[in-house]
């Protein structure tokens, strides 16, 4: 009796599975047929892009927004794909930076839909009823169109001396032997070294907008902390001394726009807080877990 009922249940389950498989095959076939249709037979997906334009060579011309229409069927999924398509097929005068197309180099940083991010990893909103506005990074001088002037930003980065500094470099085998670092000390650099210097965080910070000449900004300060906390670096005290003025660090008011907008998911606000703790004496740099110059003897 039980065996008979079990066979009936298994039979019904088998029939149900078979029907579901047939539906899946049917749906898959329909999708393939739709994809196989020529693009002319498919309904266009026209997306409007409103892009900031300004050419300094045109004397007296003010910045303006120019609208382009892109068929999303013939374009890659990212905003950078659309910009490249516009430049290649519609308007070769459109100017922007780009390089790796993988979120690694930081070249294509811009303000997209009100958020500072990287065009190469920012997906296009497929809602064609809304246009997408694209601006250069805010509160920076503009070279042309979507290209900001990064000179001040890079000069600030240069001023923190972003390289490993040792007190006895002359007596060490520089370039011939590694400086040792424990796993624990190395882990302190996680969330710091990944910064690609795209400036999305700094240009989203109101304090940086108001004090760009004196306040170093989230990106540069996070890199400063990366070298201050590195167990192999022996110049941390001097690095901190350079940050003791009222502006370099203390213009940060923990607004935290920097952390919200970082396309790499980093936390510049936390790094700045750690620098403040070191400057105030609430914390100190711990001694290295390993003798860093052991291989140089």
Curated annotation (Swiss-Prot):
InterPro entries recorded: 2Fe-2S_ferredoxin-like_sf, 2Fe-2S_ferredoxin-type, 2Fe2S_fd_BS, 4Fe4S_Fe-S-bd, 4Fe4S_Fe_S_CS, Beta-grasp_dom_sf, Helical_ferredxn, SDH/FRD_Iron-Sulfur
Residue ranges of domain 2Fe-2S ferredoxin-type in the record: 47-140
Membrane protein topology class: Peripheral membrane protein
Residues engaged in binding [3Fe-4S] cluster: 205, 252, 258
Name of a matching Pfam family: Fer2_3
Keyword entries, A-Z: 2Fe-2S, 3Fe-4S, 4Fe-4S, Electron transport, Iron, Iron-sulfur, Membrane, Metal-binding, Mitochondrion, Mitochondrion inner membrane, Oxidoreductase, Transit peptide, Transport, Tricarboxylic acid cycle
Involved pathway(s): Carbohydrate metabolism; tricarboxylic acid cycle; fumarate from succinate (eukaryal route): step 1/1
Subunit: Component of complex II composed of four subunits: a flavoprotein (FP), an iron-sulfur protein (IP), and a cytochrome b composed of a large and a small subunit.
Name of the featured protein: Succinate dehydrogenase [ubiquinone] iron-sulfur subunit, mitochondrial
């Amino acid at each position: 009796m039980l065996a008979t009922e079990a066979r009936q249940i298994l039979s019904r389950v088998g029939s149900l599975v078979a029907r579901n498989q047939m539906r899946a095959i049917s749906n898959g076939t329909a999708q393939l047929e739709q994809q196989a249709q020529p693009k002319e037979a498919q309904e266009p997906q026209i997306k409007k892009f409103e892009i900031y334009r300004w050419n300094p060579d045109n004397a007296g011309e003010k910045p303006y927004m120019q609208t382009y229409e892109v068929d999303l069927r013939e374009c890659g999924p990212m905003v950078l794909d659309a910009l490249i398509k516009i430049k290649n097929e519609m308007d070769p005068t459109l100017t922007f930076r780009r390089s790796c197309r993988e979120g690694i180099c930081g070249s294509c940083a811009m303000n997209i839909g009100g958020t500072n991010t990287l065009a190469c990893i920012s997906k296009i909103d497929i809602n064609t009823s809304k246009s997408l506005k694209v601006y250069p990074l805010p509160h920076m001088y503009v070279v042309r169109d979507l290209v900001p002037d990064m000179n001040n930003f890079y000069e600030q980065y240069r001023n923190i001396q972003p390289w490993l500094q040792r007190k006895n470099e002359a007596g060490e085998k520089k370039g011939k032997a590694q400086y040792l670092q424990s796993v624990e000390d190395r882990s302190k650099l996680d969330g710091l070294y990944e910064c690609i210097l795209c400036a999305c965080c700094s240009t989203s910070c109101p304090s940086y907008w108001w004090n760009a000449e004196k306040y170093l900004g989230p990106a540069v300060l996070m890199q400063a902390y990366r070298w201050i906390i590195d167990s192999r670096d022996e110049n941390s005290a001097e690095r901190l001394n350079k940050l003791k003025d009222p502006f370099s660090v203390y213009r940060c008011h923990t607004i935290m726009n920097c952390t919200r907008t970082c396309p790499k998911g980093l936390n510049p606000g936390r790094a700045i807080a750690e620098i403040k703790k070191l400057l105030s004496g609430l914390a100190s740099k711990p001694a290295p877990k390993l003798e860093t110059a052991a291989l140089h003897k």
